């Protein structure tokens, strides 16, 4: 069986990620797209479901999602019609505002695929660097360090501020980007 299959002429899916599928079974269809207003509820659910970097007040999540849609470009990873993760970048201030994957779908490369798209939003807005912050001692901190982000400071609330050069980075090369 080949490593990849072309579905409907455009979506490439790695079959090796789903070894339980036998030949002839339906292969999940994955793609990344810009979020729409219809995605707000699912994005809120994902933001609430994460185990780390959780807001202390769940009511803040809806306001956060409203803010993301009003002030940033939001990308979603969708598989078989289910949004599994999202990223957002604010082109006004070189920041990556959000990168979250639902816990049920972690460790599958979704965050790694979404992050370059958020960086591209900033690059297209003329920035050479991107900044973001995350709680210390979390998986997110390790993820960003492994991805080449440099610690440049600390917020009053203890979150670590990271920065990365986006000018030399390449656009999302994942076949799932649409």
Name these PLM-found stretches.
Residues 122-135:
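Conserved GNAT acetyl-CoA-binding A-motif
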Residues 115, 137-140, 157-162:
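Short glycine/proline-centered loop/turn elements that form peptide/ligand docking sites
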Residues 30, 34-104, 115-116, 121, ...:
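Acetyl-CoA-dependent GNAT
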Residues 2-38, 168-178:
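Conserved N-terminal entry element of GNAT/NAT acetyltransferase domains
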Residues 78-80, 164-167:
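Active-site beta-strand termini and strand-to-loop segments that position acidic
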Residues 131-133, 145, 150-164:
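Conserved catalytic-core motifs of GNAT/GCN5-like acyltransferases
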Residues 102-108, 136:
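Active-site acidic-Proline motif in GNAT/NAT acetyltransferases
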